Amino acid sequence: EMFSGCTALPSLDLSRLGTSQVTRMWGMFSGCSSLTSLDLSRLDASQVTNMGKMFSGCSSLSSLDLSGLHTSQVTDMGSMFSGCSSLSSLGLSGLDTSQVTDMNGMFIDCLALTALDLSGLDTSRVENMWGMFEGCSTLASLNLSGIDTSRVQDMGHMFSGCSSLASLDLSRLDTSRVAYMNGMFKGCSTLSSLDLSRLDTSQVTYMNDMFEGCSSLTSLDLSGFDTSRVRNMRGMFEGCSSLVSVTIGEKGGSIL
């Protein structure tokens, strides 16, 4: 939290900052709402394990170059870019996420992001993706093709509020360990169709508000859904004002 809450700081020179022994950068620039640019090329983060909320609330940053940031030891990236509401460009290709277990709220309320490519991210150890893209209301393109979610247990609110997404390819999403899908697609008001055939729900216990506010969906095929462990389905289809067809399978009896 070194510069946390420095709301009037317009620029920051990190070139002489000795951080070679630092293990925690949690909230380091959190709330630096006047920062318009940030050069991270000289920042030594080689020993850092926690980058949670590192840039949270940096609402004036329009772009961020992470190519020189050493993140090979980082395990926590929760809410790392949350509230970066002006961030329209974010290159993630050079980001080492091989040790990361927590990505909850990572891009929450990144209101200016129109496209995001996660194909180069190593998410093989990630267990928490709660609210990962929540509130990314202008996000029209999301590439999940290379994403590994085999260890993820929480996908609650993962795409909630992504109101500009017209399509979403979930075919590569491994949900075999996921227990939470509550609010997963809540407020995805532009989605007109959703292929859920590859979604494994055998371990899911919470589906409340899952499709709430998906006002453009006309049909849902849940024939592959196993809801035998589900405890809460409150408001699952609430506000789905265009929905005319819902298909339930043999293991989805509790939906009825």
Residue spans for each PLM region:
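Negatively charged
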Residues: 1-256
